[in-house]
Amino acid sequence: MTENNAKKEQVHTVFQNISSKYDRLNNIISFEQHKVWRKHVMKDMHVKVGSKALDVCCGTADWTIALSKAVGAHGEVTGLDFSENMLEVGKEKTKHMNNIHLVHGDAMNLPFEDNSFDYVTIGFGLRNVPDYLVALKEMNRVLKPGGMIVCLETSQPTMPVFKQVYKLYFKFVMPVFGKLFAKSKEEYEWLQQSTFDFPDKDKLKQLFEQAGFNKIKIRSFTGGVAAMHLGYKQKSSTK
């Protein structure tokens, strides 16, 4: 089994097992700050009514729902996730929302045509993908020329005080939550390790550029524990 496939299997197992507790776990771990961060990001996006959006690694569909409200009744939002169990939770939350379609799929091999979406988002999911660059290139492929990509993800704090608190939190507090909500030590250790292994905001910006995005805007939240990367797919050149 290749390293990428091994990571895929590990990620799939983790999220299959924590799906029913994921929303509560997310609220507790972030002290519900993920909701505040997402509201700020949505304001920065200025989503147009009637547009078409894709939420990659949509999980239980929180960001999918926010996008659904933004695009309105004449817009369309597709949520994609690798975990069937996470999608089942999302389907229950969105069953009365007619402009949402949830599908099972792989972020590194998106089942969509080129140039399909006005917006592509990924929230707290990129760190779980085996190859960040491959996933970003796939998101670029399915975006329409001039379309917007937005990633909201954990990051590495740069402020000394936040950096120290961040390390202590993940070393001592996070394991307690993990033991309460995860079924095994491996599951909560994955949640920790994937956060520590993820690139800082500047390195992630470089990956965005390598994937073909431009005009990249970075916004840090809560001392740098999370960051937004917002960029655009190059517009088609006119002859």
Swiss-Prot record:
Reactions accelerated catalytically: a 2-demethylmenaquinol + S-adenosyl-L-methionine = a menaquinol + S-adenosyl-L-homocysteine + H(+)
PANTHER family in the record: 2-METHOXY-6-POLYPRENYL-1,4-BENZOQUINOL METHYLASE, MITOCHONDRIAL, METHYLTRANSFERASE
Family matches, as InterPro entries: SAM-dependent_MTases_sf, UbiE/COQ5_MeTrFase, UbiE/COQ5_MeTrFase_CS
Listed EC numbers: 2.1.1.163
Function: Methyltransferase required for the conversion of demethylmenaquinol (DMKH2) to menaquinol (MKH2).
Intrachain disulfide bonds: none
Pathway field: Quinol/quinone metabolism; menaquinone biosynthesis; menaquinol from 1,4-dihydroxy-2-naphthoate: step 2/2
Name this protein carries in UniProt: Demethylmenaquinone methyltransferase
Family: Belongs to the class I-like SAM-binding methyltransferase superfamily. MenG/UbiE family.
Enzyme class: transferase
Alphabetical list of Pfam families matching this protein: Ubie_methyltran
GO molecular function, one term: demethylmenaquinone methyltransferase activity
CDD domains recorded: AdoMet_MTases
